[in-house]
Amino acid sequence: MHKLFEHQLEAVEIAKQSSNQRICLYYRTGSGKTLTSLLCMQAWNQDDVLVLAPPSTHNHWKKTAETLGITVDTISHAKFRMSHYKLSKTKALIVDEMHLLGGYKAAGWMKLNLLSRHLSAPIVLASATPNYNDADRVYCIEKILHPAKSKGYLSFLYENCKLEMNPFSQTPDVTGFLEYPDAAAYLADMRNVAYLPDNVEYEIDEVSYSFELEPAFHNYGLLSRTNRLAASQIEKEHARIIYSTIDRAGYLHKPLSDLVEQHINGPTLIFCNHSSIAEAAQRSLATKGYTTVLVTGKTTAAVKQRNLDAFRDGDVKALIGTASLATGTDGLDKVCDTLIILDDTQDDSLRRQLIGRILPRGEDSDASQKQIHRFNILS
């Protein structure tokens, strides 16, 4: 028997009252979207469901569904987008990590939109709150939930948004919403949306680390390890991060490695935006006697699951990874109180998802015991 939070019970009630059996779970990261989605399907008397979700979460979906007597078939977002993949018009559908289908011009969302017009079965859309931060994303949700209300994207903009004409585009620039402070508030107030605000309070400890690069790098963009000039500012910035963190042998520079070790406290999650830095961190910690597992975009679903299980079971000290850690990693909050953002991302939504991996669950979660260290690489 599952112990349910109030927001999960409210979502089920919204599902029951939905005239078209469609709902969006607009929850913060780590709020039990998997179980809640399936509970909505159970409320609609659905026992055979297609789940569109990241491959690393497929086993979790199936195990959770079993406890409710529901059979699920799982597919990835990539497979869903394939033109030859056909979908049933009579089978209930759960779309997890909805934002991974892209915006209104993306092939994934357009396929879902076309299916939803003819689907005679319930739909649950689910994704974490940080990912709904613009008009495009909100339109994509509204079009699926209320196809009769929402027309085209331009009509949506003119009816709901503050706009500025763009001389270089047929689509005007959105500067705000007419009746709401932002896109998030618009979605939270939408009919058939179950909303749980992202109001967990936590502190981020900023850790500064300095490394002196050669003057030729700053002056000319000389990449000394490949003996050529950086082709762009983007390449130069990537090189700056890599050169400042990784030595020529493929390990973290010793001062940085020592600084990372100082912030390890019990089972620790370590995020790196670059896979090369994640690999270097694993090598460096191994020399210090730490047991670790690595999860990157190259890690297969089976290996990722095995590594996550090893970390959850306490077999290893640190879980190191890239953006792959943002999805399919439920349950880390129960075993891990420390997150080290060694190599930060520019994506605020992704960072919030990663932080959410170690935050406790529930409506009024106390995150005072959680430690989040964000490294600032200066060079």
Task: Give each language-model segment a name.
Residues 286, 290-323:
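Conserved helicase ATPase core of P-loop NTP-dependent helicases/translocases
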Residues 92, 109-199:
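Conserved P-loop NTPase motor "coupling/switch" region that bridges the ATPase
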Residues 1-24:
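Conserved pre-motif I regulatory segment
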Residues 359-379:
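Conserved segment of the helicase C-terminal RecA-like domain
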Residues 20-39:
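Walker A/P-loop
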Residues 347-365:
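Conserved SF2 helicase motif VI
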Residues 202-290:
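Conserved helicase/translocase motor-coupling segment
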Residues 34-39, 44-65, 132-137, 273-275:
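Conserved Walker A/P-loop ATP-binding site and its immediately adjacent core
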